UniProtKB/Swiss-Prot annotation:
Transmembrane segments: 467-487, 522-542, 551-571, 600-620, 628-648, 674-694, 698-718, 785-805, 828-848, 875-895, 910-930
Leader peptide range in chain numbering: 1-19
Protein's name in the database: Miniconductance mechanosensitive channel MscM
Organism: Escherichia coli (strain K12)
NCBIfam families recorded: PRK10929.1
């Protein structure tokens, strides 16, 4: 009855699909040709008609798929019965090889069977992929149907509102009708796809199973053919060797060259046997890889099929996790690459032996006589046998190389399948509970599991595994070497302590402190801390090699997993010694370091064994003890981590450094509080059943902190190097200044006293020089680089479980319309896209802040650039980063440039009118940065302002005048107004001085005085040369003009001061008085009578009115 109802529904849907009217494609094609040939061109009409044709083509494809789905529904009983009958009729035994087949026939049969096997394997894989695609589509079909119906309703609404009879309206009508027909066919197709999904999936599974069985039979038959071929080749080689050896036994005194051929043939025969064995092993590895790939694919399909039921059952999650845990490990392709390279080398050797055979026929006896007939017959038999062996080895080598290539491909497929399973595990199982929530009976479960663990013959397995580890060559040698390394470390510990004391004594002394001391301390500290972790790793390796004892292997996995943590903790303890790296070299306070290492013994004695036990329970008996003993270990680990983290916070270790390099900021406190609260949240998550999720997140969080601490150590190492360099430079300058002072003092004393003075022996003060003020810009650059490295490292670390956050892609926030090749479609903007956009904006902000400084300090300052060019490059780089980051970030949330450009254009026009002055200044700033009419450091005069350019921004330029006042000038003024740049291409400027001289002075003498003063002035340049001219005679005074040149604007005022002093000194030396402007004074008597005397400025009287 159910089958009849399904058939009727499918028939109704298919009838609706076929009955849906659609425009005639021929008519649309004719209209399109006419539109293309029309004058003038009609691009909108052409685009609409072309869109209609594309929609009709898609409709045709949907109709074909509807027929296929309908056939599957109608013929499913018959098709499934046929496939099951074929499966039941297949023989379990493979085909037998005919014993009378020759070598050539076997080779030909092997080629044919290999081709058939490849086809069947490909067919099985295709059917598996088809079944997986059908399973994946089941979750997407409802949403696709909803979207298609919504689009269809929108098309129908637009069809109802379309009016007009123009060619464009008709073309748009054709496009809408075609889209409507396409969407109707698509809705029917999706309905039938959903109805026939189970049938199609079952048929694909049956076809895949049938192809897999056929491929297994072909593989067994192919292996039998290869075994038969190898056996024939070995038999022929052995017969040939026996016959030639029989001839050799009957002949005596054979030459050495013939005896050597016997040895070579035996070696070639042994190589042929080894090649046959290796080919059998490769074939078995191929079968194993194929079966493992099938197992992984089945686990992947099971995981995807059962993913929708994970939220309703914890047992299902546990079962799926156990199934994933039983999957094989990732293959190692490096071994195959090495073997393939060795095969190619062997092939060259065999070809060389073949090429040497003509030369071997020309050998002679030891006395130079030619070979006898018997010896020639033996030699020919040997060479014939050798040639057959070499040909067999070459053919077998090529076959083995081909099989190794197939094995490599199979391993690659297995690796891809394992990656897909890993991604699917993170996607579907990461946020599902893997153990039952804790109840009141949980302590009883712990006691029962502990009793059960002891009853598993634990100590006996460990004892037998230890005996196996001590008796195996593969494990005893590394263990013995690790013990020797530990002994050497204990013996050399006192030398290391003395080295630390000597190094610490030199730290801070200018002439003895070197950066090499810090590097040596870093290297030896890491080396001294390594022996115990190496021994721990060796023990783990030995236990993992004890494969007959699962408990020992699980413990070995736990021991190996704790090696990095143990090594890091021991390195930190070595760094924290009183004379170690942290205190003596970095200058960290001893109390802070002691507080940070307060729980060192707890880390070694509690956290490391607990992590080892946790990993052991995760790898033992399908995680049988994870819910009880494993969860207990994890809770204890979280508690210990919270205590250790609190201790590190109190020690003042920074997780975030601000611009000043200080960790005392709110971001640092927030990060530490998050780190303290993370283990407590993990305890709560494990209590409610999310043990594996809590483990993965907490492990990556703590690893992120470890990465940051490593970069913090690197930062302080670089900081110490900068401190040493700065301190040494300052000390060299101090010595130079002291030497100059002593030299000046010595020049004022007598020679005898100079030799007898105790100051002649200069003692260099080697006390510590307090120069801790390192370049803030360099340190800021280092912090920026390390922050970017930390960000990238954390992104790579967390990207391993990025698929676990795939649920964010299912949380749709809003929809946007995107147009691709003229077809509009709705795309949802998810929460994951928004978070990625926020991350892009954060990275862009960091790059904008730090990358220009990185360019300036790392690259630009080492280039020979004109003033201001570096600033222009960094500014343009900053704007480009902002533009690219903005476009990428906005595109993540659906705001594409194709939509944004119109808004930008409209805003540009509107703001251009409303804020035209600001936009003019902005554009002028860009012009200034590119054309560079002014640069930072130039001296300019604009309007009535003169000063030096100190800053060029995109809106305004800052000028500092001679009064040290900062003047903000809009950039538009430098583009639209006239201004003077005193130092654009040539910083040399002319200074013109007007010098008066008395009328009775010799003009040539005055000219020489002025030129001499100019030549003696230290700020006057020689080229162009100074010039003096007698330019005027005013009221009995000679007016001279001195024209001199200064190298830069800053020299103009000091030059005037110095040249005036030199001119006054020159006039005084030559007895020339500086004249002053003439004036006349008329004297009147006290009683009002006029005396008739007039005094000139020179004090000489003359009659009024006289000349």
């Amino acid at each position: 009855m159910r089958l009849i109802i399904t058939f009727l529904m499918a028939w109704c849907l298919s009838w609706g699909a076929y009955a849906a009217t659609a425009p005639d494609s021929k008519q649309i094609t004719q209209e399109l040709e006419q539109a293309k040939a029309a004058k003038p061109a009609q691009p909108e009409v052409v685009e609409a008609l072309q869109s209609a044709l594309n929609a009709l083509e898609e409709r045709k494809g949907s109709l074909e798929r509807i027929k296929q789905y309908q056939q599957v529904i109608d013929n499913y009983p018959k098709l499934s019965a046929t496939l099951r009958a074929q499966l039941n009729n297949m023989r379990d035994e493979p085909r037998s090889v005919s014993p009378g087949m020759s070598t050539d026939a076997l080779n030909q049969e092997i080629l044919q069977v290999s081709s058939q096997l490849l086809d069947k394997s490909r067919q099985a894989q295709q059917e598996q992929e088809r079944a997986r695609e059908i399973a994946d589509s089941l979750n997407q079909l409802p949403q696709q149907q909803t979207d298609a119906r919504r689009q269809l309703n929108e098309i129908e609404r637009r069809l109802g509102t379309l009016t007009g009879n123009t060619p464009l309206n008709q073309a748009q009508n054709f496009a809408l009708q075609s889209d409507s027909a396409r969407l109707k066919a698509l809705v029917d197709e999706l309905e039938l796809a959903q109805l026939s999904a189970n049938n199609r999936q079952e048929l694909a599974r049956l076809r895949s199973e049938l192809a897999e069985k056929e491929s297994q039979q072909l593989d067994a038959y192919l292996q039998a053919l290869r075994n038969q071929l190898n056996s024939q080749r070995q038999l022929e080689a052995e017969r040939a060797l026996e016959s030639t050896e029989l001839l050799a036994e009957n002949s005596a005194d054979l030459p050495k060259d013939i005896v050597a051929q016997f040895k070579i043939n035996r070696e070639l025969s042994a190589a042929l046997n080894q090649q046959a064995q290796r080919m059998d092993l490769v074939a078995s590895q191929q079968r194993q890889a194929a079966s493992q790939t099938l197992q992984v694919r089945q686990a992947l399909n099971t995981l995807r099929e059962q993913s929708q039921w994970l939220g309703s059952s914890n047992l299902l999650g546990e079962a799926l996790r156990a199934q994933v845990a039983r999957l094989p490990e990732m293959p190692k392709p490096q071994q195959l690459d090495t073997e393939m390279a060795q095969l190619r080398v062997q092939r060259l050797r065999y070809e060389d032996l073949l090429n040497k055979q003509p030369l071997l026929r020309q050998i002679h006896q030891a006395d130079g006589q030619p070979l006898t007939a018997e010896q020639n017959r033996i030699l020919e038999a040997q060479l014939r046998t050798q040639r057959e062996l070499l040909n067999s080895l070459l053919q077998g080598g090529d076959t083995l190389l081909l099989e190794l290539t197939k094995l490599k491909v199979s391993n690659g497929q297995l690796e891809d399948a394992l990656k897909e399973v890993n991604e699917a595990t993170h996607r579907y199982l990461f946020w599902t509970s893997d153990v039952r929530p804790m109840t009141i009976a949980w302590p009883l479960e712990i006691a029962q599991d502990l009793r059960r663990l002891i009853s598993l013959d634990t100590f006996s397995q460990l004892g037998k595994a230890s005996v196996m580890m001590l008796t195996s060559k593969e494990t005893i040698l590394p263990l013995f070497g690790a013990l020797i390394l530990v002994g050497c470390s204990i013996y050399s510990r006192r030398y290391f302590t003395r080295f630390l004391e000597r190094s610490a004594a030199k730290v801070g002394k200018v002439t003895q402190d070197h950066f090499w001391l810090t590097l040596r301390t870093l290297f030896w500290s890491i080396l001294v801390a390594s022996p115990l972790p190496v021994l721990w790793m060796t023990l783990g390796y030995g236990l993992r090699e004890a494969w007959p004892y699962p408990l020992a292997v699980a413990i070995g996995d736990g021991v190996t997993a704790t090696v990095p943590l143990l090594w890091v903790v021991m390195i930190c303890a070595t760094f924290a010694r009183p004379n170690g790296l942290f205190i003596a070299h970095f200058g960290w306070p001893r109390e802070r370091v002691s507080r940070g290492m307060r729980y060192y013994l707890m880390s070694i004695g509690l956290i490391v064994p607990l992590i080892m036990a946790l990993m052991m329970f995760d790898n033992l008996d399908d995680r049988e003890f994870s819910g009880s003993l494993g969860r207990l270990c994890f809770i204890l680990i979280c508690g210990a981590l919270a205590v250790v983290t609190l201790s590190l916070k109190k020690a003042g270790i920074p997780l975030y450094l601000n611009k000043e390099g200080s960790g005392d900021n709110i971001t640092n406190h927030m990060l530490w509080n998050m780190m303290i609260g993370a283990p407590l949240v993990a305890i709560l998550a494990s209590a409610v059943g999310y043990l594996a999720t809590a483990q993965a997140l907490l492990a990556r969080l703590e690893t992120s902190v470890a990465i940051w601490f490593l970069l913090l150590v690197v930062y302080h190492v670089i900081r110490r190097w900068m401190l040493i360099q700065r301190r040494r430079l300052a000390f060299d300058r101090a010595k130079h200044r002291r030497a100059e002072m002593l030299a000046q003092r010595a020049r004022g004393e007598e020679e005898a006293h100079h030799h007898s003075s105790p100051e002649g022996a200069i003692e260099v003060d080697e006390s510590e020089v307090d120069l801790d003020a390192i370049s803030a810009q360099s340190l800021r650059l280092v912090r920026s680089i390390l922050m970017l490295i930390a960000l990238l490292s954390v992104i790579v670390l967390w990207s391993e479980i990025h698929s676990a956050f795939g649920f964010l892609e299912n949380i749709s926030l809003w929809d946007v319309t995107s147009t691709v090749q003229g077809v509009e479609s709705l795309e949802p903007i998810t929460l994951g896209a928004v978070l990625i956009a926020i991350l892009v904006f954060i990275i862009t902000t960091q790059l904008v802040r730090n990358l220009p400084a990185l360019l300036e300090l790392a690259i630009l300052q080492h280039l020979d650039l004109t003033p201001g060019t570096g600033y222009a490059i960094t500014t343009i780089t900053k704007y480009l980063l902002m533009l690219i980051g903005g476009l990428v970030g906005f595109s993540m949330i659906g705001i594409e440039w194709s939509k944004l450009q119109w808004l930008v254009a409209a805003l540009g026009v509107g703001l251009g009118f409303g804020l035209q002055e600001i936009f003019a200044n902005f554009i002028s700033g860009l012009i200034i940065l590119f054309e560079k009419p002014i640069r930072i450091g130039d001296t300019v005069t604009i309007r009535d302002l003169t000063g030096s350019v100190t800053k060029i921004n995109t809106r305004a330029t800052t000028i500092s005048d001679w009064d040290r006042k900062e003047i903000i000038v809009p950039n538009k003024a430098f583009i639209t107004e006239q201004f003077i740049n005193w130092s654009l291409s040539d910083s040399v400027t002319r200074v013109v001085l007007t010098i008066p001289a008395p009328a009775d002075a010799n003009s040539e003498e005055v000219t020489e005085i002025l030129l001499t003063a100019a030549r003696r002035c230290s700020l006057v340049i020689d080229n162009p040369a100074p010039e003096v001219f007698l330019v005027d005679l005013q009221q009995g005074i000679q007016i001279f003009e001195l024209r001199i040149y200064a190298a830069e604007m800053g020299h103009r005022m000091p030059l005037r001061h110095e040249i005036h002093q030199l001119i006054l000194a020159g006039f005084h030396a030559h007895g020339i008085d500086m004249p002053f402007p003439p004036f006349q004074m008329r004297l009147e008597s006290l009683n009002g009578k006029q005396t008739g005397r007039t005094l000139t400025s020179a004090g000489k009287g003359r009659q009024a009115g006289s000349l």
